[in-house]
From Swiss-Prot:
Name of encoding gene: ctaB
Protein name: Protoheme IX farnesyltransferase
Subcellular location, record wording: Cell inner membrane
Stated role: Converts heme B (protoheme IX) to heme O by substitution of the vinyl group on carbon 2 of heme B porphyrin ring with a hydroxyethyl farnesyl side group.
One Gene Ontology term, aspect cellular component: plasma membrane
Gene Ontology molecular function: protoheme IX farnesyltransferase activity
Entry keywords, A to Z: Cell inner membrane, Cell membrane, Heme biosynthesis, Membrane, Transferase, Transmembrane, Transmembrane helix
Organism: Parasynechococcus marenigrum (strain WH8102)
Annotated HAMAP family: CyoE_CtaB
Uppermost EC category: transferase
Reactions catalysed, as given in the entry: heme b + (2E,6E)-farnesyl diphosphate + H2O = Fe(II)-heme o + diphosphate
Miscellaneous field: Carbon 2 of the heme B porphyrin ring is defined according to the Fischer nomenclature.
């Protein structure tokens, strides 16, 4: 009976990716390189929210390079910690460590090398605050989320999401040597964005998580409760994103106007899932859009710091000043 039920369930390859995945070398696979671009995008977003934008090319390269290395180290340590768990899940049993294509010793050496390289690059090429925050992000992902929260509570991603929200702080620290209100705003935005994004994926993979006893919200509470929680966090993301108008040093009006269709689409996807919590297509659509949404927000923050956006803001303010006061 269990085998029949398992056979009837959709696989991850059927519901998540839109195209065939590229086969990566084992040493690169464990670094989880597909997660790195979004982390670097939020790092750039944190930079764009400061008066230090744009950064000099050497500092920019050191910040992004150090962030990528720290993220890679975190990915490898996560794979090391979860190799037994991955080996028991059909979806992940073919990964480099549980399949034996890469030895744990080699992976651990790689993680240490990436960590040291990240620290050296950030300390020497950026500043100690940026380096410390990057290492804090690494530790919070491996120790707080992976080791402590993930196997114990349905709120694992709510609290553990702090790891993914640290890159904006790194970006702000790299640009100015401190973290201002703009950096903390983007940190908070990523924190409230994360649950809706991750729970959409967890809805697709809930039977995998159930099989190995990981208490993800869809496993413990079911799709209906999960969809309601996603709706709450989706609306919180939309509301908080609007404060970027105030967080930006320049270009806030431009940001606010271009933000509207992004938020409209996010709410549309959230509502669609809320109306049909069992729909894998709705969960899949929300998961994909949430990634594009955060990429779009970070790109919008950067564009808002251009001379064109500043000029647009000035023209809008001039027009508003000419309106008669009733």
């Amino acid at each position: 009976m269990a085998e029949a039920i398992s056979a009837a369930l959709p696989t991850r390859d059927q519901v998540v990716p839109s195209r065939k995945r590229v086969k990566l070398p084992p040493w690169l696979e464990v670094a989880k390189p597909r997660l790195i671009p979004l982390l670097l995008a939020t790092t750039l977003g944190g930079m764009a929210l400061t008066e230090g934008w744009p950064l000099s090319s050497p500092r920019l390269v050191c910040t992004l390079g150090g962030g990528a290395l720290a993220s890679a180290a975190a990915g490898v340590l996560n794979c090391l910690w979860e190799q037994d768990l991955d080996g028991r899940m059909a979806r992940t049993s073919g990964r480099a460590l549980p399949s034996g294509r890469l030895s744990p010793t080699s992976a651990f050496i790689g993680a240490i090398a990436c960590t040291l390289a990240a620290a050296m690059l950030l300390v020497s090429g950026v500043n100690c605050l940026a380096a410390g925050l990057s290492l804090l992000g690494l530790c919070s992902y491996v120790l707080l989320y992976t080791a402590l929260l993930k196997p114990r509570t349905t709120q694992n991603i709510v609290i553990g999401g702090v790891a993914g929200a640290i890159p904006p702080l790194v970006g702000a620290a790299a640009a100015t040597g401190h973290v201002g209100l703009g950096g903390w705003w983007l940190f908070a935005l990523v924190m409230v964005w994360t649950p809706a994004h991750f729970w959409a994926l967890a809805l697709l993979l809930r039977e995998d998580y159930r099989a190995v006893g990981i208490p993800m919200l869809p496993v413990v509470k079911g799709p209906v409760v999960t969809a309601r929680a996603i709706r709450r966090y989706g609306w919180a993301t939309v509301l908080l994103s609007g404060f970027g108008v105030l967080a930006l040093p320049t270009g806030g009006v431009f940001y606010g106007l271009i933000l509207l269709p992004f938020n409209g689409r996010l709410i549309q996807m959230v509502q669609r899932l809320s109306m049909d919590p069992d729909s894998l297509m709705a969960a899949k659509g929300l998961f994909r859009w949430s990634i594009l949404y955060l990429f779009g927000i970070c790109l919008l923050l950067i564009l808002s710091r251009t001379d064109l956006a500043s000029s647009f803001d000035q023209q809008v303010m001039f027009v508003l000043q000419q309106l008669p006061i009733v």
